[in-house]
């Protein structure tokens, strides 16, 4: 009798994706983040579903319903904080996953990479809309400021903003539609993840050397299933420490004040995972220029395959490019810090310099370093 997992139409797909998948024998812990992202997505959908059972998307009761979840619903507090801090874990894994792709040249798998960039945009949009739902001060003003950026679009900007708001300000209509989109988008993300994996399994995984690994592959199960489970345990350990000991560490205290359109918080800022892009947006005095820079800060990832000039795929054996990569990482940390600071001296100039350096490294310095390394190899 033929093994059922190899013959059954449905089990066959799972078998080819998770069990008998030929995987390079030398992939490191940096390849764990894909599976961790899958677990994060599952956790967010599950906790989000239970939160949606008790949440009301009305401006008068939204804030109270979140309080009710935390105080009166059985284990509501842990569901709420797992969802809020699960988003932070999601973005930590997401940034490390993208960073891995940049370091080891995984962007040369064009379809997989481009779907990944679309996924990044979709997850960011979902997280932004989720941040609006508790209807605290930062939720309301964050929604007002970020959606208002669309008014910078020439000619149609103002109409577009009012169309998104469903009125002349962020109000009940905005909250209701944001809740609807926040609920549906994770399922669209799940579909995109399947497409992402489909394209990845067409080419097979990259590996740290960036070389062809067809000659040395091992089955995904049991080797990498065990490795992934270890990753899950470590991630859940960190998540539970965060949820049980300091659940509000990554949040904003202003969000514990109900939304008030008549009172602007002294410093409006998004969640920590958007601060780098927010710093780039604020570093340009012109509104339209800032919005374009904000979009380009993520969209620039699509250009990476075109900016690849090196004869080698990975940065593993390229010391000059390695230095630039880690300067870029430090620059992103700087931008994240600046995004959380008030708009005053010296933070303005630091933010502007960090923003220039961000684009300069990716668009100019990395491609030049690749050309230089090619020449050094020929000496």
Curated annotation (Swiss-Prot):
UniProt-listed SUPFAM superfamilies: a domain/subunit of cytochrome bc1 complex (Ubiquinol-cytochrome c reductase), Transmembrane di-heme cytochromes
UniProt cofactor(s): heme b
Disulfide bond sites: none
Localization in the cell: Mitochondrion inner membrane
Residues annotated for heme b b562 binding in this entry: 83, 182
Bilayer topology annotation: Multi-pass membrane protein
Organism in which the protein naturally occurs: Eospalax fontanierii cansus (Gansu zokor)
InterPro entries cross-referenced by the UniProt entry: Cyt_b/b6_C (IPR005798), Cyt_b/b6_C_sf (IPR036150), Cyt_b/b6_N (IPR005797), Cytb/b6-like_sf (IPR027387), Cytochrome_b (IPR030689), Cytochrome_b_C_euk/bac (IPR048260), Cytochrome_b_N_euk/bac (IPR048259), Di-haem_cyt_TM (IPR016174)
GO cellular component labels: mitochondrial inner membrane; respiratory chain complex III
Pfam families the record matches: Cytochrom_B_C (PF00032), Cytochrome_B (PF00033)
Family statement: Belongs to the cytochrome b family.
Subunit relationships: The cytochrome bc1 complex contains 11 subunits: 3 respiratory subunits (MT-CYB, CYC1 and UQCRFS1), 2 core proteins (UQCRC1 and UQCRC2) and 6 low-molecular weight proteins (UQCRH/QCR6, UQCRB/QCR7, UQCRQ/QCR8, UQCR10/QCR9, UQCR11/QCR10 and a cleavage product of UQCRFS1). This cytochrome bc1 complex then forms a dimer.
Amino acids binding a ubiquinone: 201
Function text: Component of the ubiquinol-cytochrome c reductase complex (complex III or cytochrome b-c1 complex) that is part of the mitochondrial respiratory chain. The b-c1 complex mediates electron transfer from ubiquinol to cytochrome c. Contributes to the generation of a proton gradient across the mitochondrial membrane that is then used for ATP synthesis.
GO term, biological process aspect, one: mitochondrial electron transport, ubiquinol to cytochrome c
GO molecular function, a single term: ubiquinol-cytochrome-c reductase activity
Keywords for the protein's UniProt record, in alphabetical order: Electron transport, Heme, Iron, Membrane, Metal-binding, Mitochondrion, Mitochondrion inner membrane, Respiratory chain, Transmembrane, Transmembrane helix, Transport, Ubiquinone
Sequence positions that bind heme b b566: 97, 196
Miscellaneous comment in the UniProt entry for this protein: Heme 1 (or BL or b562) is low-potential and absorbs at about 562 nm, and heme 2 (or BH or b566) is high-potential and absorbs at about 566 nm.
Cofactor note as given: Binds 2 heme b groups non-covalently.
The protein's name: Cytochrome b
TM region positions: 33-53, 77-98, 113-133, 178-198, 226-246, 288-308, 320-340, 347-367
